[in-house]
Regions:
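Short, contiguous alpha-helical
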Residues: 1-22, 26-29, 34-81, 121-159
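Acidic/histidine-rich alpha-helical segments that form the ligand environment
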Residues: 82-121, 135-141
Length: 159
C-alpha cells in the first residue's frame, strides 16, 4: 500500500473502521441524543457535540491547507459554538465530520506525494500545526481525532 493510501486509510479509521485503538468517532457518537451530546458533565470541559465541531473545523482546515490555503485557525473557529440544539442539528454535525474526514481522505489519495515533504507555513507554531511537513500534519490530524475520540469515549460513559 502506498503512503498516501495508508494516510487516507488512517483518516477514515478515525471516523469509522477497524481501528486498533478502539471505537472510532463515528461509533462513539452514534446513538446519542442531542441532549446527551450537548451535556457538560465536567466543569470547564467540552461537550461531545463541541468536540465533534472542533474536530470538523480542524479536518476542514487541513483540507484547505492541502488545497494551497495559508495555515490559520479554522474558518469555523477553534471551538465553534453548537448553535441550534435539535436532533437534526446534532445529526448534521456528525454528518459534517464524517464528510470532512472522507473529503480529506479523498484529497490525500489524489495529492502529489512530493507535497508530503514540504513544510506547512513559515515557522513552528505547535497549536497551529505549522513548521512541520505535510506528512507530519496529516498524521497529526489523525492523532487529533483520536485524542478527542478518547475524550468522547469517557464522556459517553457519563451520558
Amino acid at each position: 500500500m502506498r503512503e498516501l493510501q495508508r494516510l487516507a486509510d488512517q483518516l477514515e479509521r478515525s471516523w469509522d473502521g477497524d481501528a486498533w485503538h478502539g471505537p472510532a468517532l463515528g461509533e462513539l457518537t452514534q446513538g446519542l441524543s442531542a441532549a446527551q451530546a450537548h451535556r457538560h458533565h465536567l466543569a470547564e470541559a467540552h461537550s461531545i457535540w463541541e468536540l465533534v465541531l472542533h474536530c470538523t473545523a480542524w479536518v476542514r482546515e487541513v483540507s484547505r491547507r492541502l488545497g494551497g490555503t495559508e495555515p490559520s485557525l479554522p474558518l469555523e473557529g477553534d471551538w465553534p459554538e453548537v448553535g441550534e440544539q435539535s436532533e437534526a442539528a446534532w445529526e448534521a454535525a456528525r454528518e459534517a465530520l464524517k464528510e470532512a474526514i472522507r473529503g480529506l481522505a479523498r484529497a490525500v489519495r489524489e495529492m502529489d506525494p512530493a507535497l508530503l515533504d514540504r513544510t506547512v507555513g513559515e515557522g513552528r507554531d505547535a497549536p497551529l500545526g505549522t513548521g512541520t511537513t505535510f506528512y507530519v500534519m496529516l498524521h497529526g490530524v489523525v492523532q487529533h481525532n483520536l485524542y478527542h475520540a478518547g475524550q468522547v469515549a469517557l464522556l459517553r460513559k457519563l451520558a
